[in-house]
Amino acid sequence: MKAAETYCLQLLRSRAYELYFAVLFAPPAKRGALAALYAFQLEILHIGEQVQEPLLGEMRLQWWHDSLMAALKKDIQHTGIKEQNSAETLPIMAQQNPVIAAVTVAINRYNLPPAAFLCLCEAARFDLYRDIMPSRAALETYCTALYGTVLQLACRILGGETSNLADKTCRHGGVAQGLAALIRHLPRTQRQGKIYIPADILASMGVDEQSLRNNVAGQEPAENLAKRHNIIIEKRKIAIAAILACFHEHYKAFIQAQKLLPAGFRPAFLPLAVLPAFIKQAEKRQEAVFTTPLIISPLRKQAKISRAAFFNRF
């Protein structure tokens, strides 16, 4: 494994242990490319998690976009000089960013479409702003772009061209993964004033945006504040129940489709094996997920992923 790929693997180990552990079940020759893919996704998602000013976030996203395009262009020029290095050497921009370097190698080695990586950058722009997610369809499109795309790319690394069934599996799995991430990150997005629960779902259930965006505060009598607090709690329960129902719908469809795929694709989906454990916590906590992080130990993640890897039980 090249130095840049090793860097990506260690990045996964520190930020997203389930991704790191899942990569270890892939064939050794494919691990570096998978680590690079996941590391790129993490870096893109990390921008919305850390940046408070949208303009700064836009600049960082544009940097990743431009750096990847420049690396691919320079690598093609380099390949014209030394054709035999097209899949085995690191690109010229390796010294600038190891994630860009490793992703460039993966794109060239496995003929991955660069547009898919740019799709990640474009979809992540929503994370920079405080606009409410407009509809369930928009949320599913967002999740497919940020998570389903990565699953599709992982499948291409593992097995070459993907079938319609594999694409369907990736779509449902990506939406389920995105919805679980939505719930897991609620304490942070709540602090940032961001709302990912779709406006049309909220409206259909009589939940107003302010019930999700604000906590109870003010100079009202204690009795009135308590009443408002109880109303907000009930509305948040309704909102979370809607997202949980949507998750179960997509995760069930994912499992049904995944069982029909060749075993060689399985490592791509192993990170999803930990999702039910997070969702069970969310179902117990209900509205508390807005303020309390959902945490699963690395050992439990290992157990869930290992069971899926050996027995195909998600």
Predicted regions and their residues:
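Catalytic cores of Mg2+-dependent Asp-rich isoprenoid enzymes
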Residues: 1-75, 85-106, 110-124, 141-152, ...
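A generic structural motif
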Residues: 159-161
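Catalytic cores of transferase enzymes with a strong primary signal for eukaryotic protein kinases
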Residues: 82
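Acidic/His metal-coordination segments adjacent to aromatic residues that form catalytic metal sites
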Residues: 125-138
